Amino acid sequence: MVIILTIVGLILLTGFQALVNSLKKTYLIEIQYYRQFNQASSSLNWAKKQVWQPPSEQWQCLLDNQYQFKACIKKSRLKIDNYTLLRAQADDYYLYMLTYFADNHLIIEKGHWLDYCPEKRLVDCE
């Protein structure tokens, strides 16, 4: 009887340990996602205040070494309006924003923040 209780207890502890490991992995993945999202979001806000050269067909990037911000702009290929595509990067996570370009600054309109690239072809997002 003692052996059966020991085996059942061992099985329960093993199952509980597997559950804890799974939850810990999920937690670490979510922490990394939120860190990257917040870093990319901060990069977007930083990029709005920078002085840019006129956008071209190629990505033009600015870096901030102190805070590890990276943001890039290029002309959007969307047929509507004359958008400039702003891309902020944190590791391998990207956020996008459709903006207008005037006087070497980006003009932002509310509602143009995106967590996906709005271009039709994937190659235009790389």
What are these regions (language model features)?
Residues G15-L19, S43-Q50:
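Short hydrophobic alpha-helical module
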Residues M1-I3, I7, Q53-E57:
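Charged/polar interaction segments and conserved charged motifs
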Residues T26-Y27, Y34-N38, N45-E126:
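Conserved functional hotspots that engage anionic ligands or polymers and/or phospholipid headgroups
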Residues I3-N38:
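Aliphatic-rich helix starts adjacent to a transmembrane/signal segment
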